[in-house]
């Protein structure tokens, strides 16, 4: 059995077309959804991510503002910029690209963003809303994973889901989203005693640790759905995920590729969150 691919590029195109349609309707009512992206320093990977986000906005009919600052920018200066963007009615979403320079407290900056504009879903108010099932913005990567499961028509009720990784950005919110859909969820991490014993019981596995080959074919139950959030490089310098793709695809029922799986979905859900922030603001 060879797994069916869950094509993140194709699903992203569908969702972005819907974003563009809804953005056009908002514009007719006098509101153009706006995203501000703030980049501090010259981290090469961050520059690529930021360019992709701005490009995606433009292609979907969203207004975007890119603010670039020198790595020497002070924390107080950055907080002042965030405050100004909070009070700018043309901006509906604020994204401060991480990582920030070491002298800036990233959590303090995230908490300075208005929860109404927290389209990354990292604010403690967003985390609390997710925990309690209240309306709020979901972190984009796990949100994208959920959309992929929805796209293949997968019913999570009563299923056993294993999340490998416990970060605040992916692992923890992923577990909560799966739980909200009535899955039984196990979260594994670096201190998990026997990872294979856990994953072999799983109907759904989400790998999100940032380490190659953390999940191999002998660790996967036949027919399981495997979502690969990892972004690594192999020995030839090519992009790869956390999953041994060639091996696992022969066992799994569905699998996401890297690249072309979760990656494009992350940016797409940022657009969805920004659009929804604008719709809420417009009333």
UniProtKB/Swiss-Prot annotation:
Pfam families in the cross-refs: THF_DHG_CYH, THF_DHG_CYH_C
Example GO BP: methionine biosynthetic process
SUPFAM superfamilies: Aminoacid dehydrogenase-like, N-terminal domain, NAD(P)-binding Rossmann-fold domains
Gene Ontology MF terms: methenyltetrahydrofolate cyclohydrolase activity; methylenetetrahydrofolate dehydrogenase (NADP+) activity
Record's GO cellular component terms: cytosol
UniProt-listed Enzyme Commission number(s): 1.5.1.5, 3.5.4.9
Catalytic activity: (6R)-5,10-methylene-5,6,7,8-tetrahydrofolate + NADP(+) = (6R)-5,10-methenyltetrahydrofolate + NADPH; (6R)-5,10-methenyltetrahydrofolate + H2O = (6R)-10-formyltetrahydrofolate + H(+)
Alphabetically ordered keywords of this record: Amino-acid biosynthesis, Histidine biosynthesis, Hydrolase, Methionine biosynthesis, Multifunctional enzyme, NADP, One-carbon metabolism, Oxidoreductase, Purine biosynthesis
Residues the record lists as binding NADP(+): 165-167, 190
Source taxon at top rank: Bacteria
Coiled coil: none
Pathway(s) annotated for this protein in UniProt: One-carbon metabolism; tetrahydrofolate interconversion
Function: Catalyzes the oxidation of 5,10-methylenetetrahydrofolate to 5,10-methenyltetrahydrofolate and then the hydrolysis of 5,10-methenyltetrahydrofolate to 10-formyltetrahydrofolate.
Protein family according to the UniProt entry: Belongs to the tetrahydrofolate dehydrogenase/cyclohydrolase family.
Subunit structure, as described in the record: Homodimer.
NCBIfam families assigned: PRK10792.1, PRK14186.1, PRK14189.1
Protein known as: Bifunctional protein FolD
Source species of the chain: Paracidovorax citrulli (strain AAC00-1)
Organism phylogeny: Bacteria, Pseudomonadati, Pseudomonadota, Betaproteobacteria, Burkholderiales
Gene responsible for this protein: folD
């Amino acid at each position: 059995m060879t797994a069916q691919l869950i094509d993140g590029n194709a699903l992203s195109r569908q969702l972005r077309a819907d974003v563009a349609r809804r953005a056009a309707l908002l514009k007719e009512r006098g509101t153009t959804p706006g995203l501000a992206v703030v980049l501090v320093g010259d981290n090469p990977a961050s520059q690529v991510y930021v360019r992709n986000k701005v490009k995606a906005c433009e292609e979907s009919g969203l207004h975007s503002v890119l603010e670039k600052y020198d790595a020497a920018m002070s924390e107080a200066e950055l907080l002042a910029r965030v405050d100004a963007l909070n009070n700018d009615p043309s901006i509906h979403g604020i994204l401060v690209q991480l990582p920030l320079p070491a002298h800036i407290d990233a959590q303090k900056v995230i908490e300075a963003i208005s929860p109404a504009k927290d389209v990354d879903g990292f604010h403690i108010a967003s985390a609390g809303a997710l925990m309690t099932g209240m309306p709020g913005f979901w972190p984009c990567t796990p949100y994208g994973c959920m959309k992929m499961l929805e796209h293949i028509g997968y019913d999570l009720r009563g299923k056993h889901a294993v999340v490998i990784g416990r970060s605040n950005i992916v692992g923890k919110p992923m577990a909560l989203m799966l739980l909200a859909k009535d899955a039984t969820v196990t979260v594994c991490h670096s201190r998990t005693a026997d990872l294979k014993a856990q994953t072999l019981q799983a109907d759904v596995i989400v790998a999100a640790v940032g380490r190659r080959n953390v999940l191999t074919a002998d660790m996967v139950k036949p027919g399981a759905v495997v979502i690969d959030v990892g972004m690594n490089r192999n020995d030839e310098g090519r992009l790869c995920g956390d999953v041994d793709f060639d091996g696992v695809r022969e066992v799994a029922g569905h699998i996401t590729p890297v690249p072309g799986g979760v990656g494009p979905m992350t940016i797409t859900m940022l657009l969805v969150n920004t659009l929804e922030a604008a719709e809420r603001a417009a009333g």
